[in-house]
Amino acid sequence: ELGYPIDTTSDNYYNWGQGTIAHNTVLVNDRRQTYEKTRVDAPIHYDGDGLVKLMDVDAPTRYGATSIYRRSVVMVNVDDDVSYGVDFFRVKGGNEHLYSFHSLADEIFETENLEFTKQANANGEYIGSYVGPNVNYGTTGISNGFSWLKNVERDRAVEEKNIAVDFQIKDFRNQFRETRNLHLRMTMLNSFT
């Protein structure tokens, strides 16, 4: 989670910040999760002590189309400089599942098993948003948040494959005490269904 740095009265907040896709989670059928302040999901397990931390939550009613919507996250601190997380996200139901992952980076450092095609005009300039080339960045009224994703590049491969993306972290808010070469690497394994 990247926190909440945006103004709660802006279009960005209502069209992006409140959306499921903004929060490193799984979007089902291109729709936001249902949100009710009175709903309590089921925390299965939590252990925040020691070098290995674990959280397991079940939230099957977040989407009407799902019977399973469960996330288990393990964080492991190897030493002062290295840590890693393992994210098991299980979803059953719905027709499409989109795992959203982003970081404090404005470019991708390197990838494995991905061949991106830039969504661009004839001059090679980025156009549109994740909705498509004809829907501009920041277009309001699209509740899934896709119009708030720009500089779109897609891998059109249809086969399941393991992929990896390495983000070089950028200190957008000047929070680091010293300049560091920080990276966040995400490795996705293909389906285990």
Task: Give residue ranges: language-model regions.
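Polysaccharide-binding surfaces and accessory modules of carbohydrate-active proteins
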Residues: L104-N190
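Catalytic and substrate-binding regions of extracellular carbohydrate-active enzymes
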Residues: E1-V131, V135, I142
